[in-house]
UniProtKB/Swiss-Prot annotation:
Cofactor remark: Binds 1 divalent metal cation per subunit.
Gene3D superfamilies xrefs: Aldolase class I
Protein name: Ribulose-phosphate 3-epimerase
Native organism: Rhodobacter capsulatus
Catalytic activity: D-ribulose 5-phosphate = D-xylulose 5-phosphate
Length: 228
């Protein structure tokens, strides 16, 4: 996984057909997905329950691009090795999930993965400034975490601030929540380069009509690129 700031679309399989994950992953990748985003929720840090390491390992068999695993769990550190063994390429933990995010990011890198730090809408950008040297991805939540399909919360000022803080470090700014052809360009103009989209990609399509996924991915990408 090499670093560049080109626009990347990361469909969230939380919005896919749960009965057909393998073919759904194959479909979105064939239709232009750059990363595959996997939302892990524990029913404790967030009020929903999704995928553990065995599910992520099953997804890995189908993912040919980058498997981007977003941990919405607390605690995090005890599970890092399990997600590394499951095949995560990027493992993202929330700054709000514990008191030692620096140690968590170090452990993620030590396990052979790219490290990500996520930040909720109510948390200021300054909360992660001290770990930007050991982060590969900063994930800015533009919804409160826990469920797909929520209404977008504008985080333009926060993204601009983070872009300035990051400077020339090789760190992606990823946006998670409510991304579509209207909201993605706002974030791209502020400095983001990776866009997580669940319903924005999967709405209206299926493994039988994957071209809909392709149109949705292309529309988000084109809108974001036009804002640069």
């Amino acid at each position: 996984m090499t670093f560049d700031r080109s626009i990347k679309i990361a469909p969230s399989i939380l919005s896919a057909d749960f009965a057909d994950f393998g073919r759904e992953i194959q479909a979105i990748e064939a239709q232009g997905a750059d990363w595959v985003h996997v939302d892990v929720m524990d029913g404790h840090f967030v009020p929903n329950l999704t995928f553990g390491p065995p599910a992520v390992a099953a997804f890995r068999k189908h993912v040919k691009t980058v498997m981007d695993v977003h941990l919405m769990i607390s605690p995090v550190d005890a599970y890092i090795d399990a997600y590394a063994q499951a095949g995560a390429d990027v493992l993202t933990a929330h700054v709000e999930a514990g008191p030692h995010i620096h140690r968590t990011l170090q452990a993620i890198r030590a396990a052979g993965m790219k490290s990500g730090v996520a930040i909720n809408p109510g948390t200021p950008a300054e909360a992660i400034e001290h770990v930007l040297d050991i982060a590969d991805v900063v994930c800015v939540m533009t919804v409160n975490p826990g469920f797909g399909g929520q209404k977008y919360i504008d985080m333009t000022a926060k993204v601009r601030k983070l872009r300035a803080m990051i400077g020339d470090r090789p760190v992606h700014i990823e946006i998670d929540g409510g991304m579509d052809p209207v909201t993605a360009p706002l974030m791209a103009a502020a400095g983001a380069d990776v866009f997580v989209a669940g319903s924005g990609v999967f709405k209206g399509g299926s493994v039988s009509t994957p071209e809909v996924y392709g149109k949705n991915i292309a529309a988000i990408r084109a809108a974001a690129q036009a804002a640069l």
